[in-house]
Amino acid sequence: MAETKTKVTLVGTVLAKPGTEFVYEGESPECETCKVKKACNNLNRGHRYRIITVRSTHHDCAVHLNGATAVEVMEAPVTMLISADMAMINSKIKVEFSCNKTECRSYSLCRPDGVVEGEKYVVADVLGNASDICGKGRALKLVEIRPA
């Protein structure tokens, strides 16, 4: 599998710590007139990122109370449940959320934050069987996925 490249972006100074993970939700209306908005909004909406390095560059920000700090990020792996027949290391999968049972104890693993429906991912690791029985009777495996 190809090595993941880092990207420089801006995040709220309070969040700017190596190892912090976040899901990029897109541009805020307050960003409209900002001169550095391209540096903040250069990530993929709905994807999970991990901060690798914090840089010394700091900017005032209308969104973040203590301003924004430059960081290097990479897309972070996400743990989720998928159909057991798709759970093969290095296989490419297209994520489709077919269950809407919000009361299910595994719901957050079947529809995790940081995964975009319809996009392709690579199964990086198979972590084992689902800890709970699927309410729809499906055979599920817990896997770690990365963007394809």
Curated annotation (Swiss-Prot):
Domain of life: Archaea
UniProt-listed InterPro entries: UPF0179
Family named by the database record: Belongs to the UPF0179 family.
Protein name listed in UniProt: UPF0179 protein Mboo_1959
Species of the source: Methanoregula boonei (strain DSM 21154 / JCM 14090 / 6A8)
